[in-house]
From Swiss-Prot:
Belongs to the neurotoxin 09 (Tx3-6) family. Disulfide bonds join 2-16, 9-22, 13-48, 15-40, 18-55, 24-38. Expressed by the venom gland. It comes from the Eukaryota. GO terms for cellular component: extracellular region. GO terms for molecular function: toxin activity. The keyword Secreted applies. The presence of a 'disulfide through disulfide knot' structurally defines this protein as a knottin. This is U7-ctenitoxin-Pr1a. Keywords: Disulfide bond, Knottin, Neurotoxin, Secreted, Toxin. Probable neurotoxin. It is found in: Secreted. Its main location: secreted. It comes from Phoneutria reidyi.
Length: 58
């Protein structure tokens, strides 16, 4: 299943829905190391287009 808003995630595709993205407050190294962790947050119409291309479950 997918992760709801506020849940810990590793990538955008982990998050439920087209408009939710995986946000990392301190994403220093391009997504490889997350000192504070990442969580699903509400994005925008652009994340929806990106997820439609990249995620099999959208």
């Amino acid at each position: 299943g997918c992760k709801a808003r506020g849940d810990t995630c590793q990538k955008d595709c982990d998050c439920c829905g087209c408009f939710y993205k995986c946000h990392c407050p301190l994403d220093w190294f391009g997504g490889k190391w997350h000192p504070l962790g990442c969580s699903c947050v509400y994005g925008d119409k652009y994340i929806c287009e990106k997820k439609k291309k990249e995620c099999p479950n959208v």
